[in-house]
Amino acid sequence: MENDKEGKYVYDYVSYLYRKGIIDLSEVIEKVKSISDNKNLLTNLISLEFVENYENALIVKENEDIKKMYWSRNVRLRISDKAEHRVFIWALNECKKYGSFNTYLELLYDIKDKISVQELYKATLEISDIKSDVASSMTDYYLEEIFDILQQTFIDDDEKCAELATLEWMCRNVLEWEHMKCMQKIMKDDPTFYALLVSIIYKADDNENIDEEKRKLANKVYSGFDKAKFCPTEKDGEVIYENLKKWIEKFKELLINQKQERLFGNLVGRLLAYSPIGEDGYSPCEAVRMVIEEYYTDSLKTAYVVAEENKRGVHMVDAGKSELILHQRYQKNAEALQERYPYTADIYFAISDNYKREAEYERKRAEDEL
């Protein structure tokens, strides 16, 4: 070992012999301890074991430092196929105590089919007690897969759904909005949390002084607020007018209490743009059209137009052909709504006109480049 200070050759050799079943790993580890204080090598060797019975697992006998190194490693835990259910629970508890956010999440993903959904729920909530480290390239995938199981099971359980929504929010910098289904439900059902975010991010009407602490908090929550793109009260592609009106009225009342009523039209327009289509095949759905007609303002219109156009995202430049198609599509939509929903139609005419101007601009630019 004098010529192998890192222990790489020793590890490779022992690993080969162990896989062949030639050596007793515990004896090798004791021998290594007697001639070296290489903790990394020791941890590597212990990690070769497939744990079947945790009472006899090699890692159980080690000190706190080795346990922290073992459970903090980005190497998949090796648990024998013969292991009992309690071994997986033991592993979770040990990893929570000694490991990192990433190794705990990785382990939770690996054993999600080995434990009950109730145990998975409980173990997932405990993520909030673990100090987060730098997200790995797989963090978002693990979270999405675990949350998907829990969301499908507990979305209609108000208490558990609220707990999961809190955890989704904690992971907002990793999860995309479409994977934050419990938070979506919370916001769609009631405007209280959304209004709370507004109170943190925006100033009140009385020109309140913003201290450094509130500015930092606003910066922390803004990314999550910006991700929140939803139509209030929408469920399974349907919006009921009475429910939507109740949500809108409560939201307005909350803004008034927060001295932020001036933001009402802008915020509502931003959300209503995410309405499902109507039964007649045109956008937005009938309930949203009725609300727009009732609460229409210039700020609502502007916010709706911006949100709708932002949905397009990145697109190919094709001399204005795509923009011309969009102009015609939105114009047709507006004309279908014009008689019964004039304010809503006005919004769609505005979007249509914007794309018409953009189509003309792109066409001329393409001609100039020839």
Residue ranges and their predicted role:
Residues M1-E309:
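Non-catalytic all-alpha helical scaffold/repeat segments
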Residues Y13, N74-V75, L267, L326, ...:
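Structural register within alpha-helical repeat arrays
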Residues S299-K311, V317-D318, E367-L370:
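Non-globular sequence segments
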Residues T344-N354:
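Short, charged, amphipathic alpha-helical segments
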Residues A319-Q331:
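Short amphipathic alpha-helical heptad-repeat segments
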Residues M316, E323-L324, Y341-P342:
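Inter-repeat boundary and helix-capping residues of tandem alpha-helical solenoids
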Residues Y355-E369:
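Amphipathic alpha-helical coiled-coil segments
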